[in-house]
Amino acid sequence: MQIWVDADACPKVVKEVLCRAATRTGLQITFVANHYVPVPTAPNIKSIQVESGFDVADDEIVRRSEAGDLVISGDIPLAAELIEKKVQVLNPRGELYTEATIKARLNIRDFMDTMRASGIQTGGPAALSQTDRREFANQLDRILAKVKKTI
């Protein structure tokens, strides 16, 4: 299993958790962004900088990821596309998107886009809380434990 990170909007604390997990497990992790993302010097941790542009990093993740990989992203349309490829998607708040939940998430996202387009101020997501950080780390550990059992 390879871990891919949609690093353009990934919180720093989540990146730190991921780097510690990669160091501990030896799994390959790749941060993909349209800007430079500094990563620790380790053979299994790398960063790919893609061109600037709408969804360029997302497209690179879709192109490179394979069934069984894990992607860290809060981008719901990207998650939907990856789930079709049988790629696991975990958001930075610790929610694992699934075939059963992604359609509802897409509908909510589209509804909020429609509201914003009509001039209604919907606000953005809340800042990442300590509970979110803990839930992300716990969910990541559960996923990695399952991978370890299959190796």
From Swiss-Prot:
CDD domains in alphabetical order: PIN_YqxD-like
Pfam families, per the entry: DUF188
InterPro entries assigned to the protein according to its UniProt record, in alphabetical order: UPF0178
Ranges annotated as spanning the membrane: none
Family indicated by similarity: Belongs to the UPF0178 family.
Name of the protein in its database record: UPF0178 protein VSAL_I0701
Organism of provenance: Aliivibrio salmonicida (strain LFI1238)
Species lineage: Bacteria, Pseudomonadati, Pseudomonadota, Gammaproteobacteria, Vibrionales
